[in-house]
Amino acid sequence: MQTNSVICADALTVCVDDRTLLDNLNFNVGKGEVFALLGGNGAGKSTTLKTFLGLMKASSGSATVLGHNASTQPNQLQKSVAYLPESVTLYGHLSGVENIRYFLSVAGVDKSDDDMFAALRKVALQEDSWNKALSNYSKGMRQKTAIALALLRNAPVLFLDEPTSGLDPAAIDEFNALVSELAAGHAARSR
């Protein structure tokens, strides 16, 4: 592992039964860098994320986040990593604000309403929708709520699985700009 790496795959191999899902994967991601895994269905993108989150174990090699081996120290990752899965479970009978409050309390994260509102503005979710039930939200609005929730974790590492799913082209551009802004902020703090 390189000493300046925040995320490191070192000869990472993951096998399930007799199938090799990842084979000798190697990469390093430094602080403030944006890194994307691209590939078709079955290429191993979600398997890679699950391995770095400690949800799947490496068969050989290692997956480390902030120096913690994801296979042997998964509990060490919980406060260091925020994860936005491809399909986020939010409660349709609760409003966007109520969902965020609930999931932050479950995670033990204490945030003020001002912090929450700032995150919702940052992801460009219209204010008139914040207190409406999620059952009235479009898929894109639900995704923006989930992104705001992930941002509120203030974790040094943010894993995103298909984060722009359900967003229109303008919202995708806004999201990409937001990710660049977040990465630049982390890079500036590391100097």
Model-derived features: where do they sit?
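The feature captures the beta-strand-to-loop junction immediately N-terminal to the Walker
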Residues: 38-40
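Hydrophobic anchor residue at the start of the ABC signature
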Residues: 147
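Catalytic Walker B motif of ABC-type/P-loop ATPase nucleotide-binding domains
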Residues: 158-162
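Conserved structural motif at the start of ABC-family nucleotide-binding domains
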Residues: 7, 22-24, 78
